[in-house]
From Swiss-Prot:
<dbReference type="Pfam" id="PF00762">
    <property type="entry name" value="Ferrochelatase"/>
</dbReference>
<comment type="subunit">
    <text>Monomer.</text>
</comment>
<keyword id="KW-0456">Lyase</keyword>
<comment type="pathway">
    <text>Porphyrin-containing compound metabolism; protoheme biosynthesis; protoheme from protoporphyrin-IX: step 1/1.</text>
</comment>
<dbReference type="InterPro" id="IPR033644">
    <property type="entry name" value="Ferrochelatase_C"/>
</dbReference>
<dbReference type="GO" id="GO:0004325">
    <property type="term" value="F:ferrochelatase activity"/>
</dbReference>
<keyword id="KW-0479">Metal-binding</keyword>
<dbReference type="InterPro" id="IPR019772">
    <property type="entry name" value="Ferrochelatase_AS"/>
</dbReference>
<dbReference type="InterPro" id="IPR033659">
    <property type="entry name" value="Ferrochelatase_N"/>
</dbReference>
<feature type="binding site">
    <location>
        <position position="194"/>
    </location>
    <ligand>
        <name>Fe cation</name>
    </ligand>
</feature>
<feature type="binding site">
    <location>
        <position position="275"/>
    </location>
    <ligand>
        <name>Fe cation</name>
    </ligand>
</feature>
<protein>
    <recommendedName>
        <fullName>Ferrochelatase</fullName>
        <ecNumber>4.98.1.1</ecNumber>
    </recommendedName>
</protein>
<comment type="similarity">
    <text>Belongs to the ferrochelatase family.</text>
</comment>
<keyword id="KW-0963">Cytoplasm</keyword>
<dbReference type="GO" id="GO:0005737">
    <property type="term" value="C:cytoplasm"/>
</dbReference>
<dbReference type="GO" id="GO:0046872">
    <property type="term" value="F:metal ion binding"/>
</dbReference>
<dbReference type="InterPro" id="IPR001015">
    <property type="entry name" value="Ferrochelatase"/>
</dbReference>
Length: 320
């Protein structure tokens, strides 16, 4: 029997190549052109995207990226590369490639990299702990487009999500415990997930249920009372209703109600990025403190910590 050679494809969202309006515009154009992300009629969406959104948002978003940019690139790229390298070191006989849905390195370049290693089985791990059609679904779509152009197709194992994976929950819990030990236990632990339009959930996307699963399992692992843990949704875009409650509005309300100390974690982000380091760690900190809150800490993503890499290794092992 022929022995199978397996490769691993780590997939994430993507990032601009530079914190400049031009690079951000290229990235946003690709990102916001995906029907999995915005499913508005193209006749309505294209003029709005090209004539209004890209010209106005690109310079502003570029400044935000510049505020968190690291010496070796954007935080998401730096931490994603560290994850790839650490997982490859943990699994020395298994090729590990990194691909992004938008920007570089592309998912296609990652697939080609693995095929050049003569793998005949690819384990695809989208680094989105909670499934959503707008994230994991986009990886699935692009992978199908890539393989449709190949004469020979490798075996594919696709990990839908890992919202209640034991190692993932334990890694989150240990990160929370470390933050509590450093800063003191807060009045409230707020778990902020990236939002999606409410309509997507109404049409069958089980993302909110998967977020609730992670929240429930994490609270249980920490032994925290339900009233000490709150789940919210961030980063809404456009005018239609998104999943609620909204993170920024909740933080304002909590500050006004006299809640003094909050710690915030974003369990849906496998690596820190603009949304966590700028929106959550900075903007929403000001919202809470400005509303009367006294103390606010952001708990970093798992990034390339040894516990996170071990979780990834154990997760893909079941599919090899």
């Amino acid at each position: 029997m022929r022995q199978t050679k397996t490769g691993i494809l780590l997939a994430n969202l993507g990032t601009p190549d530079a914190p400049t309006p031009e690079a951000v515009k290229r990235y946003l154009k690709q990102f916001l052109s995906d029907r999995r992300v915005v499913d508005t009629s193209r006749l309505l969406w294209w003029p709005l995207l090209r004539g209004v959104i890209l010209p106005l948002r690109s310079p502003r978003v570029a400044k935000l990226y510049a505020s968190v940019w690291m010496e070796d690139g954007s935080p998401l790229m730096v931490y994603s590369r560290q994850q790839q390298q650490a997982l490859a070191q943990r699994l020395p006989d298994t090729p590990v490639a990194l691909g992004m849905s938008y920007g570089s390195p592309s998912l296609e370049s990652a697939v080609d990299e693995l095929l050049a290693e003569h793998v005949d089985h690819i384990v695809v791990l989208p680094l989105y702990p909670q499934f959503s059609c707008s994230t994991v679904g986009a990886v699935w779509d692009e992978l199908a487009r890539i393989l449709a152009r190949k004469r020979s197709i490798p075996g594919i194992s696709f990990i839908r999500d890992y919202a209640d994976n034991h190692d993932y929950i334990n890694a989150l819990a240990n990160s929370v415990r470390a933050s509590f030990a450093k800063h003191g236990e807060p009045d409230l632990l707020l778990l902020s997930y990236h939002g999606i339009p409410q309509r997507y959930a109404d049409e069958g996307d089980d993302y909110p249920q998967r977020c609730r699963t992670t929240t429930r399992e994490l609270a249980s692992a920490l032994g925290m009372a339900p009233e000490k843990v709150m789940m919210t949704f961030q980063s809404r875009f456009g005018r239609e209703p998104w999943l609620m409650p909204y993170t920024d509005e909740t933080l304002k309300m909590l500050g006004e109600k006299g809640v003094g100390h909050i710690q915030v974690m974003c369990p849906g982000f496998a690596a820190d990025c603009l949304e966590t380091l700028e929106e959550i760690a900075e903007q929403n900190r000001e919202v809470f403190l400005g509303a009367g809150g006294k103390k606010y800490e952001y708990i970093p993503a798992l990034n390339a910590t040894p516990e996170h890499i071990e979780m990834m290794a154990n997760l893909v092992a079941a599919y090899r």
